Amino acid sequence: MKRYIYNILILLSVGLLFSCQSSHKKLLNSNNNDAKYEAAVKAYEKGDYYKANQLFENLILYFRGKDKAEDVNMYYGKSLMEDGQYYVAGYQFENFVRWFPYSPKAEEALYLSAYCKYKESPDFYLDQTLTQESIKAFKDYIAKYPESPRVQEANKCLDELRMKLIQKDYTQAYNYYKVGQYQAAQTALKGFINKYADQTKYRQDAMYYIVLADYHFAMGSVEEKKKERWNNMILDYERYQALFENFTDKTKIEDLKSKYEFAKKELENLK
């Protein structure tokens, strides 16, 4: 008996699903655009964003130039965004700003176009073109609406996006050290420090690996180059020590200190 009831419930659920799908398809193909609009808004409010964006997309041409045009276009962009279709949603919000530049919703649309790019921004080790586009979009938004309450959130997103670029640049510079290209590591890590002087954490790591790269580079040098390169290592170590001695774990400090003492002995032997 229980199995029979269970099977009946399954059949009813499947039937209801097909009925809903059939009703949605009929509505999409109908000419009753007011009913379609009401159904689209209800679907959006219920969180059925896929159905909502299908219906709103279907309504854009019909409502062009009419009172509901702004609402339809804004709902369409938001339903795409909520459905996770950030690339298409961002494009729709950009269109909204172009089509309705004087709308009260234009500010929100400009912010959401930047936000959609932010959501599309990949992990730091991948290509960062979208990250850079999102940074530009948020900067443009802040420049245009500096008093907006959304500026605080925009700045948070900007900080996160910039950190991705910093991580990528640091990782690329560090990778030269990792593969034993010590001269290239020195150049890349020093370039990183100059570019991001305000980034204490990565600056500390970069300077640590500069000293290590100096050490390995000097160790592998021909005799006539060793004096210059040991001197460079000593100078870089002393800069590191002055800035970060109290902020570095003891293992790293002891490791660098032993290499520093070795460098001084090598210089004494070269006199």
Where are the regions that the model predicts?
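Sec-dependent bacterial lipoprotein signal peptides
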Residues: 1-20
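Acidic, polar-rich low-complexity tracts and alpha-helical solenoid repeat scaffolds
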Residues: 5, 19-271
